[in-house]
């Protein structure tokens, strides 16, 4: 079973749109223990420094990038399940992306879609997929094949 209290989302910039924040709040309630931390947006080097200082030594670094691995929802759920009790840190960069140093540090790089989304929406998509993955692993009815 997936344990959201072992997951953190680190995002550059603020969530400014109320409807996105409402969606995030809905899934945060469904995923007790999951936290989202927002870091100030800046230039890539300063953002990389903020990200590096936020990574805990026992966390696997998972970044969201255009170049990342593309998965189905079932594939994502199975991959998370295979990581077992690992602590996971999902990082969503700013509109400028992520510094190459952070990309090189990543344990796993994923892409939510070949389409480009505002970074606020990427947060909502990620948290929804985390909820969906948890539901898939628990045999719930949220995900339909």
Curated annotation (Swiss-Prot):
<keyword id="KW-0808">Transferase</keyword>
<dbReference type="Pfam" id="PF02590">
    <property type="entry name" value="SPOUT_MTase"/>
</dbReference>
<keyword id="KW-0963">Cytoplasm</keyword>
<keyword id="KW-0698">rRNA processing</keyword>
<comment type="function">
    <text>Specifically methylates the pseudouridine at position 1915 (m3Psi1915) in 23S rRNA.</text>
</comment>
<dbReference type="GO" id="GO:0005737">
    <property type="term" value="C:cytoplasm"/>
</dbReference>
<keyword id="KW-0489">Methyltransferase</keyword>
<feature type="binding site">
    <location>
        <position position="93"/>
    </location>
    <ligand>
        <name>S-adenosyl-L-methionine</name>
    </ligand>
</feature>
<comment type="similarity">
    <text>Belongs to the RNA methyltransferase RlmH family.</text>
</comment>
<comment type="subunit">
    <text>Homodimer.</text>
</comment>
<keyword id="KW-0949">S-adenosyl-L-methionine</keyword>
<dbReference type="GO" id="GO:0070038">
    <property type="term" value="F:rRNA (pseudouridine-N3-)-methyltransferase activity"/>
</dbReference>
<feature type="binding site">
    <location>
        <position position="64"/>
    </location>
    <ligand>
        <name>S-adenosyl-L-methionine</name>
    </ligand>
</feature>
<protein>
    <recommendedName>
        <fullName>Ribosomal RNA large subunit methyltransferase H</fullName>
        <ecNumber>2.1.1.177</ecNumber>
    </recommendedName>
</protein>
<dbReference type="InterPro" id="IPR029026">
    <property type="entry name" value="tRNA_m1G_MTases_N"/>
</dbReference>
<feature type="binding site">
    <location>
        <begin position="112"/>
        <end position="117"/>
    </location>
    <ligand>
        <name>S-adenosyl-L-methionine</name>
    </ligand>
</feature>
<dbReference type="InterPro" id="IPR003742">
    <property type="entry name" value="RlmH-like"/>
</dbReference>
<dbReference type="InterPro" id="IPR029028">
    <property type="entry name" value="Alpha/beta_knot_MTases"/>
</dbReference>
